[in-house]
């Protein structure tokens, strides 16, 4: 037997053996890990984590593939690589050579995001078995078969450069990047996701391919599926598409080590000043806070709302209402490791930035030491967050996308645990975190201008999320809605009409909705040619003032009442119409309708 024939036989035998092993592997079903409030986690033998959220009330399917790699994982010379790879994965595979076109043909669009801790790709499609199978085939194929070619890298470089230049020309974004880089001396959170221009433009294609092969593997990925689908069918297709992908070899350079770089405890104030072309000024401050999984984040969320809430926020009252600043905001970011609490103010070009910064310090550090947070402030903030979480959970698509961030923090169930913590946080908790983390010694300040005391703060380590969540069951699942036929004929049949004596027309579409959710849409048309003439601006001003209070409720009380009724949305108007859209729950619908009437009938136009 010739050597050439032996080689052919050997290769054929190897292929048969590999095919047989993959077939056996694919036939092994997934393992159910846990289930919380209607969401169930499974694990494939190759390590792929699968999260299913069936929602028959949604006529769509959202497929969200998250890879546990972001800019935090980039090595020296690799900054921007995770984001650059996100672009190249859309360039296709041999089986899916034109991904954007295929998505468009199915009524979806290319969607991908890169953050500090993760990268995700997602598509929302009409709920059919064919679309589900196609999306799963796409995601499994581009997990391991993306081209990642030098030609695609060159062609995409213009797009990436444009993103870089857009960020560099945005005063807020560039100041935030500079302030973060000063706040984090060693940790990769101090490097922007977009990366250094020199790294992005100079990265060898082979290095990018190595990054792709290392991190785009089933044992480093989480597949979230939400919407209208049959779990049994979905699991069968997931095993069929992803189960044949072998577990990667994690030896040598392919081993993924936990990131272990930690910044030393900050020992004094730091500051950054940017002088660039621009039309506005900014003052911002970053304080180090614990990781997103830490129990203090719930209290820090409440604290940020106490500072920046419109109408009652302390910074809003001190800076916006006094017209010293155009706007203020505060965010307690939730990352896998120790993250930032960002607070900033936007100031007019001719305003006094020094005066604004002095006021910011008085409010922030006064809140931490003297003018302590009150019970009413905590309750108002709690109602705001819990309302948004509750109403947001009515959208399975929204939850599917949110879970990417919670997965990257350590576990998708942290979403529910954080909600529970928000419900239980006390005023003393908020005062404690303010006193613990809001210290000048723990701050990095940034100023954008157009044209020190050794009191150290120890940041807790990332908690053991597995131990923390062992046995966690969550609450009862939200009541599912009906599987609604969205055809015009069915909508017409199900819609109930009524006309009042005054000519007011009412259309009602009763159906079982997820979480007993109700949406009210109101449209009032009025006016004639004489009343419309020269009144456009006046009409817009009147419409814009409707949500600022009534004879019974001032603006803050009106917002509180909407939160109490678990309603969101609003009423506005113009010179020829008024109306709005509000969302609430079924039991509160009568009260919400009464409130809409009050807003329209008895508004107060304070000077």
Give residue ranges: language-model regions.
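Hydrophobic h-region of N-terminal signal peptides that target proteins for export
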Residues: 17-26
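Non-catalytic, conformational "gating/processing" segments within enzyme and secreted inhibitor domains
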Residues: 157, 172, 209-241, 442-443
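Catalytic Zn2+-binding segment of zinc metalloproteases
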Residues: 88-95, 549-551
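Bacterial N-terminal signal peptides that target proteins for export
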Residues: 2-16
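Short, conserved secondary-structure transition motifs
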Residues: 161-167, 259-274, 381-392, 584-585
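Proteolytic maturation boundary segments
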Residues: 25-50, 230-276, 317, 416-525, ...
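M16 family metallopeptidases and their MPP-like homologs
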Residues: 53, 58-74, 80-81, 98-141, ...
């Amino acid at each position: 037997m010739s050597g050439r024939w032996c080689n052919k036989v050997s290769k054929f035998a190897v292929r048969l053996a590999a095919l047989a092993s993959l077939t056996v592997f694919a036939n092994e079903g997934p393992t159910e890990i846990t289930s919380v409030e209607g969401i169930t986690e499974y694990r494939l033998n190759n390590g792929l984590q699968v999260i299913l959220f069936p929602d028959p009330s949604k006529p769509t399917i959202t497929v969200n593939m998250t890879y546990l790699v972001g800019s935090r994982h980039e090595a020296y010379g690799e900054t921007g690589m995770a984001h650059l790879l996100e672009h190249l994965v859309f360039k296709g595979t041999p089986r899916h050579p034109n991904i954007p076109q295929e998505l468009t043909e199915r009524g979806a669009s290319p969607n991908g995001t890169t953050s500090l801790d993760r990268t995700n790709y997602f598509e929302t499609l009409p709920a059919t078995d064919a679309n589900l199978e196609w999306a799963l085939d796409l995601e499994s194929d581009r997990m391991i078969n993306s081209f990642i070619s030098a030609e695609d890298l060159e062609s995409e470089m213009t797009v990436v450069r444009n993103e870089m230049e857009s960020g560099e020309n945005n005063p807020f974004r560039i100041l935030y990047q500079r302030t973060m880089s000063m706040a984090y001396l060693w940790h990769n959170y101090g490097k922007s996701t977009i990366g250094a221009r020199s790294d992005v433009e100079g990265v060898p294609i082979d290095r990018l391919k190595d990054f792709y092969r290392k991190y785009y593997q089933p044992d480093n990925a989480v597949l979230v599926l939400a919407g209208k689908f049959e779990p049994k069918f979905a699991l069968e297709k997931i095993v069929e598409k992803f189960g044949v992908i072998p577990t990667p070899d994690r030896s040598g350079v392919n081993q993924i080590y936990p990131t272990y770089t930690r910044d030393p405890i900050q020992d004094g104030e730091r500051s950054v000043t940017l002088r660039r072309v621009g039309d506005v000024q900014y003052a911002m401050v970053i304080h180090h806070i614990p990781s997103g999984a830490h129990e203090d984040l719930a209290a820090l969320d409440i604290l940020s709302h106490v500072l920046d809430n419109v109408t009652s926020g302390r910074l809003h009252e001190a800076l916006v209402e006094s017209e010293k600043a155009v706007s203020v905001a505060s965010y307690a970011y939730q990352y896998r490791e120790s993250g930032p609490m960002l607070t900033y103010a936007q100031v007019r070009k001719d305003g006094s930035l020094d005066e604004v910064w002095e006021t910011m310090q008085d409010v922030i550090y006064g809140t931490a030491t003297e003018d302590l947070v009150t019970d009413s402030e905590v309750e108002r903030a709690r109602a705001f967050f819990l309302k948004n979480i509750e109403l947001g959970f009515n959208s399975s698509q929204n939850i599917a996308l949110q879970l990417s961030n919670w997965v990257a923090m350590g576990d998708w169930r942290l979403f529910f645990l954080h909600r529970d913590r928000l419900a239980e946080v006390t005023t003393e908790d908020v005062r404690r975190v303010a006193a613990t983390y809001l210290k000048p010694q723990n701050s990095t300040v940034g100023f954008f201008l157009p044209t020190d005391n050794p009191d150290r703060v120890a940041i807790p380590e990332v908690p053991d999320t597995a131990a923390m969540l062992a046995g966690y069951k969550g609450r009862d699942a939200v009541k599912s809605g009906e599987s609604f036929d969205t055809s015009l004929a069915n909508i017409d049949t199900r819609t109930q009409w009524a006309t009042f004596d005054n000519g007011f027309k009412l259309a009602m579409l009763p159906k079982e909705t997820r979480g007993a959710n109700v949406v009210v849409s109101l449209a009032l048309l009025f006016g004639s040619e004489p009343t419309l003439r020269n009144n456009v601006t006046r009409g817009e001003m009147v419409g814009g003032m409707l949500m600022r209070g009534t004879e019974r409720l001032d603006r803050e009380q009106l917002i509180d009442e909407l939160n109490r009724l678990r309603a969101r949305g609003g009423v506005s108007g113009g010179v020829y119409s008024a109306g709005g859209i509000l969302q609430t729950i079924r039991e509160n619908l009568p009260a919400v309708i009464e409130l809409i009437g009050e807003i329209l009938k008895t508004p107060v136009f304070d000077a």
